[in-house]
Swiss-Prot record:
Listed Basic and acidic residues bias regions: 452-466
Name of the protein this chain belongs to: Dol-P-Glc:Glc(2)Man(9)GlcNAc(2)-PP-Dol alpha-1,2-glucosyltransferase
Cell membrane found in the keyword field: no
PANTHER family: ALPHA-1,2-GLUCOSYLTRANSFERASE ALG10 (PTHR12989), DOL-P-GLC:GLC(2)MAN(9)GLCNAC(2)-PP-DOL ALPHA-1,2-GLUCOSYLTRANSFERASE-RELATED (PTHR12989:SF10)
UniProt keyword annotations, A-Z: Endoplasmic reticulum, Glycoprotein, Glycosyltransferase, Membrane, Transferase, Transmembrane, Transmembrane helix
Main location as per UniProt: endoplasmic reticulum
Pfam families given in the database record: DIE2_ALG10
Record-listed E.C. numbers: 2.4.1.256
GO CC term, one of those recorded: endoplasmic reticulum membrane
Enzyme class: transferase
Record's subcellular location: Endoplasmic reticulum membrane
Biological pathway: Protein modification; protein glycosylation
Gene name of the record: alg10
Role according to the record: Dol-P-Glc:Glc(2)Man(9)GlcNAc(2)-PP-Dol alpha-1,2-glucosyltransferase that operates in the biosynthetic pathway of dolichol-linked oligosaccharides, the glycan precursors employed in protein asparagine (N)-glycosylation. The assembly of dolichol-linked oligosaccharides begins on the cytosolic side of the endoplasmic reticulum membrane and finishes in its lumen. The sequential addition of sugars to dolichol pyrophosphate produces dolichol-linked oligosaccharides containing fourteen sugars, including two GlcNAcs, nine mannoses and three glucoses.
Length: 614
């Protein structure tokens, strides 16, 4: 039976509820404006700078601001449009500027995320499911660090929006007419993303450029059937690419894929360079800015010197696990537990290749590397330990409470968390393959009789009743002979159909994980500070490319017979999505309440309320 996602009233209700739930974003901003009307924390720098631009003082710049002026230009455009249409605002305060962030978070970002997610599904040749797409977009917009800063005047929302828009145009330019014009628009949106935040270079140039290289190589090469490392290198120079599905890839397969990409890339060097020209233009523009600015950050250079902070690539895994456990928990249970103990409601029917914990030798390679990073490269920025208003202050307080804790986190939070997060790209299933039955004499007779009926109907339209009756009786007398397939042939057909189905579904492959990891690492390891905001774009890209939650096996084998069964199937399939929604709402309610109503004072600043935040 088909493995299409079941549709019932509950999924459609979730889809239509999305705009109403997104109203929480302006409501959150309104509450912040009531309780915290004045600029808070980084807003103290951003709000006066935006006000200077509003007064057309374009050359005024606060030397403490580290990011480019894109946020202030965005606010200027929206506020100028509002002034023309409504006659206000004539002067900008924190509330008016926060509203420009809300416009991005509640209107433009959901729209462009929906467009991007739909495009990604179509590129993968899968049927878009409107309810699932809309619910996924909603959950991304409710992602707690993203939701929290949507009510404040920070750069994160508009920065993410620019990256998403660049991704949309990168997909558009690969298909259809006017590709040159679309490429120019993509380059413009990519440069716009850099005007909002410097680290966006790793997403609009490295990430999107890497995906373009992989697409080009896959289009111009054949799939490699090699297994050994030497064979993979040789097949690469024969234009055969080794790139297994994430669901079938081991740790060593990622090493093989890296080597295969290099060898196939060398064979297709000129076409790759041509296809990456737009990304190279963006990289060149960024390089020119760095040379002109004598560094990456604009202000406070003494506190934001670039370095190698490898521990960031350890912290990201518990970060993802904390926020995304609702969509990870049941697939992970399917991976580690035998099918016999999993309730049918949550049994996804994963294959043997998908199931199981990481292999021992994988742990023996990865865990010592992680321990070495913890020992030699744990960097704690002075700002982290000096500011108890951020939750990350208390995380590091726990890690520093005993020397053994930071090492104990390696096999549990870092290694297992990383395995679960990367495995999530392979949480996909395929529909059952048609079962072929060898044709026997009774089968031949049934097939012949079926053919007779079709033939008789066709003859009836073309000839007289008498001649038609004669021809039909002749066909009845001699049923057509049919060849019998051997079991070996049937097995090969089954295997071929299974491979074709996987190719059509096009779930993430090892090459995508490598590109995503590269962009994530480059954007994080160069940052000395550990801030939850820095992980937003890596999380969003991870969340966008996760395959849909698997349909339980019992509902793939048999279609729901009535509305009640359809409701049960829909609940089982979308249960994780709803859990994610409720989890995000709970976190947002808790952190919002703490921010607004659980303030405290510093002894050195009496009378001034300090507030907890991400």
């Amino acid at each position: 039976m088909s493995a299409v996602r079941p549709v019932s009233g509950i999924s459609l209700a979730a889809r239509y509820a999305v705009p109403f739930v997104l109203l929480l974003i302006p409501l959150w901003m309104a509450k912040v404006n009531t309780v915290v009307p004045d600029p808070y924390l980084d807003e103290v720098f951003h709000v006066p700078q935006a006000q200077a631009y509003w007064d057309h003082r374009w050359f005024h710049w606060d030397p403490k601001i580290t990011t480019p002026p894109g946020l202030y230009i965005w606010s200027y455009i929206l506020c100028a449009a509002a002034l023309v249409l409504r006659g206000s605002p004539k002067e900008l305060n924190a509330g008016a500027l926060r509203a420009t962030n809300v416009a991005a978070a509640a209107v433009f970002l959901p729209w462009r995320l929906q467009t991007l997610l739909d495009a990604l599904r179509k590129v993968r040749n899968t049927r878009p499911s409107g309810a699932w797409l809309s619910h996924t977009v909603l959950n991304i917009c409710l992602f707690p660090p993203l939701f929290f800063f949507s009510g404040l005047y920070y750069t994160d929302i508009v920065s993410l929006l620019a990256v998403i828009e660049a991704y949309n145009w990168d997909i558009k330019r690969s298909a259809g007419s006017w590709s040159l014009l679309k490429t120019a628009v993509f380059v413009a949106t990519g440069l716009t993303a850099l005007v909002l935040r410097q680290t966006n270079i790793f997403w609009v140039a490295i990430f999107l450029g890497g995906l373009q290289v992989v697409r080009r190589l896959r289009q111009s090469s054949k799939a490699s059937q090699a297994s050994s490392l030497l064979q993979i290198i040789q097949s690469g120079f024969n234009n055969e690419l080794y790139d297994p599905l994430v669901s079938e890839a081991s740790f060593f397969d990622y090493v093989k894929t890296s080597i295969s990409l290099v060898s196939v890339g060398l064979r297709n060097f000129i076409p790759i360079i041509i296809s990456t020209v737009p990304y190279l233009v963006i990289l060149a523009a960024f390089g020119g800015f760095v040379l002109w600015n004598d560094g990456v950050v604009l202000g406070h250079k003494e506190f934001h010197t670039a370095g190698l902070h490898l521990s960031q690539m350890l912290y990201i895994w518990p970060y993802f696990m904390f926020f995304s456990w609702p969509i990870l928990i049941f697939p992970v249970i399917n991976l580690v537990l035998p099918n016999s103990v999993i309730p049918a409601f949550f049994d996804y029917g994963f294959t043997k290749k998908q199931k199981g914990l990481p292999r021992i030798w994988t742990a023996l390679v990865i865990i010592p590397i992680m321990l070495a990073v913890v020992h030699f490269n744990t960097i704690i920025h002075p700002f982290t330990l000096a500011d108890n208003r951020h939750y990350i202050f208390y995380v590091f307080r726990i890690l520093r409470s005993h020397p053994a804790i930071r090492y104990a986190a390696v096999p549990t939070a870092y290694f297992v968390g990383g395995w679960a997060v990367i495995s999530a790209f392979g949480f996909s299933t395929t529909k059952p393959q048609p079962q072929f039955v060898p044709i026997t004499k009774s089968n031949e007779l049934a097939a012949a009789q079926k053919g007779q009926l079709k033939e008789a109907a066709r003859k009836k339209e073309k000839s007289e009743r008498k001649s038609k009756s004669k021809k039909a009786s002749q066909v009845t007398a001699s049923p057509p002979a049919q060849d019998q397939f051997s079991p070996e042939v049937l097995a090969r057909i089954q295997e071929h159909l299974a491979q074709r189905q996987k190719q059509q579904q096009e779930v993430p492959r090892a090459s995508f994980v490598l590109v995503w990891l590269a962009a994530t690492a480059l954007s994080l390891v160069t940052a000395p500070l550990v801030e939850p905001r820095y992980f937003i774009i890596p999380w969003v890209m991870w969340r966008l490319h996760l395959p849909p939650q698997p349909v339980p096996l019992v509902y793939r084998q048999q279609r729901p017979r009535d509305e009640r069964e359809a409701l049960h199937a829909d609940l089982a399939t979308n249960f994780s999505l709803f859990m994610e929604t409720y989890w995000f709402l709970a976190i947002n309610a808790a952190t919002g309440y703490i921010f607004l109503y659980k303030g405290f004072e510093w002894p050195q600043e009496p009378g001034k309320v300090q507030r907890f935040m991400w």
